[in-house]
């Protein structure tokens, strides 16, 4: 599976996937050091400039990228390139997007507008079938889940929570279950979130508050000696 981080938040989460051998990680942002799987964009002053000046990466960074691909991004200015990047990927991959919803109370007016734009467009892409799935996670809810954390470790904890949860879902999806009651997923229900559930109390901690979810899937990891 390919993991593409776009912008600072996306790249930081993508970096967490490097600890797992199942993923090919690509990072796209400004100020990145030259390395394999990395593309450093030129700094632009406006989000639309990142879209208008986004390079063609099909023959370089994206060469050989096909199959299941997850694009991770948020509302930073570099996210202005996300639609152009999806255009370059759409005929090569089965694309899903993980969108990190920021704390709206701390956003500037310009970033708030960018958040609304990208968030709404991604939802339309999911509903129209351009995306296999749109995962939405909310920084405010994630903050509540990780609890009291030293400032220096705050975003590291959140990024690790997101990446490890997604990784475990991929592991479950590609492992034979001892028992399952899954039905075929609803094809038109492509906007999703992630969450954790306490096995004993059944308390659910969702990463984003979806309006009227149409389907839920629960994965239980039970030690073999208990089975």
Where are the predicted features?
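Tubulin/FtsZ superfamily GTPase core signature
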Residues: 1-227
């Amino acid at each position: 599976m390919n993991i593409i981080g776009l912008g600072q938040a996306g790249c930081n989460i993508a970096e967490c996937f490097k600890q797992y051998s199942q993923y090919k990680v690509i990072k796209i942002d400004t100020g990145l050091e030259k390395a394999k799987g990395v593309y450093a964009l030129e700094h632009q002053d406006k989000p639309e400039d990142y879209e208008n000046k986004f390079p063609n990466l099909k023959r370089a960074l994206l060469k050989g990228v096909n199959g299941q691909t997850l694009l991770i991004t948020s509302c930073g200015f570099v996210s202005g390139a996300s639609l152009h990047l999806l255009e370059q990927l759409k005929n090569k991959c089965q694309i899903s997007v993980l969108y990190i919803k920021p704390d709206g109370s701390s956003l500037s007016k310009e970033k708030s507008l960018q958040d609304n734009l990208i968030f709404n467009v991604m939802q339309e892409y999911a509903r129209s079938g351009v995306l296999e799935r749109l995962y939405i996670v909310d920084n405010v809810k994630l903050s509540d889940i990780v609890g009291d954390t030293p400032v220096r470790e705050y975003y590291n904890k959140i990024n690790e929570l997101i990446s490890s949860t997604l990784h475990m879902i991929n592991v479950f999806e590609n492992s034979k279950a001892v028992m399952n009651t899954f039905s075929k997923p609803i094809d038109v229900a492509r906007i999703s979130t992630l969450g954790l559930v306490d096995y004993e109390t059944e308390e659910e901690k969702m990463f984003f508050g979806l309006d009227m979810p149409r389907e839920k899937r629960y994965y239980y990891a039970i030690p073999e000696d208990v089975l």
